[in-house]
């Protein structure tokens, strides 16, 4: 084997053994640098005879090309290996649950989740959100909603009253979110399409009642609103909220001072197991009350009942949360028990949408 062949074998072996780009560069310099072994051989070409250049000169040039190609190929392999090693070391599994991150271990309270779900549903129908004060006057909480003097709801045992002010007027913790309906009618002209989620207060406390609880009410005012519209809106809401393909509902005549006619709405369900299933079964469960807005309430809101009419409905957010997600005791909602929140709460980034799923 000639000295050129030996050098070729030696250099190719060193190139193949280089484990990183620094080692490879050292081999390249030792072969092709100014004082490299291949460069030294190239310097001898000038002193060769024409015959030697055809044989030995060609072999030296072939050696140079072989070393150059081998270095380039090895460099490419090392770059790919380096990238793969970095990816392996720095990979973040985006499929891991959010709760694995310390910053994301909190939970969204079921009531906040329910409000977001209901907002998503009614926003898709063209409704906006209205809000009002928790501390109300007797006028907005009772009088403007057609509660007559002497109505049981005005009694101390049912409502939280503040001490009378210097004018003898007593304010109350609102017993429903309905005062916002009157305030909205006073503030804007029809058509009106709003939902009103918020806190309400009544003197009641047991497994299914709390002195402070949450309601959502809806109000539609225009010139042609009717009972058929109520049925459609509530049926679409129930199907979407309980995430079922269809629901069977029944409207039972009832009485509320602020609506006429008034209805209690039941939804068909299956109560044979530990969890209530909607969209199937032969049982019935009351979920909300509704009706056509009473003409007197329209008048208190500054609207002419001969020109405008509307419908309204209301339901307890805490109760429908219990029905949908299976919480057994309403009082647990307000105990700030981290274990309960971990079990029933929702991940912070799982915002409910109609497209992505309400409770996904």
Swiss-Prot record:
Annotated EC: 6.1.1.20
Co-factor note (free text): Binds 2 magnesium ions per tetramer.
Requisite cofactors: Mg(2+)
Gene Ontology CC entries for this record: cytoplasm
Species: Rhizobium etli (strain ATCC 51251 / DSM 11541 / JCM 21823 / NBRC 15573 / CFN 42)
The protein's name in its UniProt record: Phenylalanine--tRNA ligase alpha subunit
Principal location: cytoplasm
Alphabetical list of SUPFAM superfamilies matching this protein: Class II aaRS and biotin synthetases, tRNA-binding arm
Enzyme class label: ligase
Catalytic activity, reaction form: tRNA(Phe) + L-phenylalanine + ATP = L-phenylalanyl-tRNA(Phe) + AMP + diphosphate + H(+)
Domain of life assignment: Bacteria
């Amino acid at each position: 084997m000639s000295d050129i062949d030996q050098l070729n074998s030696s250099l190719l072996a060193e190139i193949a053994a280089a484990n990183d780009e620094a080692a490879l560069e050292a081999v390249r310099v030792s072969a092709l640098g100014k004082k490299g072994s291949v460069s030294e051989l190239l310097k001898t070409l000038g002193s060769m005879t024409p015959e030697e250049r055809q044989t030995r000169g060609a072999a030296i040039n072939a050696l140079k090309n072989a070393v150059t190609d081998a270095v380039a190929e090895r460099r490419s392999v090392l770059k790919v290996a380096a990238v793969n090693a970095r990816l392996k070391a720095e990979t973040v599994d985006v499929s891991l649950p959010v709760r694995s991150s310390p910053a994301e271990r909190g939970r969204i309270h079921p009531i906040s989740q329910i409000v977001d779900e209901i907002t998503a549903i009614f926003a898709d129908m063209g409704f906006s959100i209205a809000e009002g004060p928790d501390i109300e006057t007797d006028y907005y909480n009772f009088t403007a909603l057609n509660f007559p003097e002497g109505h049981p709801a005005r009694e101390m045992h049912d409502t939280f009253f503040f001490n009378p002010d210097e004018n003898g007027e007593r304010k109350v913790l609102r017993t429903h979110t309905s005062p916002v309906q009157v305030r909205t009618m006073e503030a804007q002209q029809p058509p009106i399409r709003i939902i009103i989620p918020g806190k309400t207060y009544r003197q009641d406390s047991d497994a299914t009642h709390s002195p402070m609880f949450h309601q959502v009410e809806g109000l539609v005012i225009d010139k042609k609103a009717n009972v058929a519209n109520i049925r459609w809106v509530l049926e679409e809401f129930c199907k979407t909220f309980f995430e079922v393909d269809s629901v069977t509902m029944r409207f039972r005549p009832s009485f509320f001072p602020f609506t006429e006619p008034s209805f209690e709405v039941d939804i068909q369900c299956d109560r044979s197991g530990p969890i209530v299933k909607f969209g199937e079964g032969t049982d019935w469960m009351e979920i909300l009350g509704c009706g056509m807005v009473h003409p007197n309430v329209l008048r208190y809101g500054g609207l002419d009942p001969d020109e405008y009419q509307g419908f309204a409905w209301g339901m307890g957010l805490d109760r429908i949360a219990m029905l949908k997600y299976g919480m057994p005791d309403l009082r647990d909602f307000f105990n700030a028990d981290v274990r309960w929140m971990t079990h029933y709460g929702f991940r912070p980034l799982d915002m409910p949408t109609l497209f992505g799923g309400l409770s996904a």
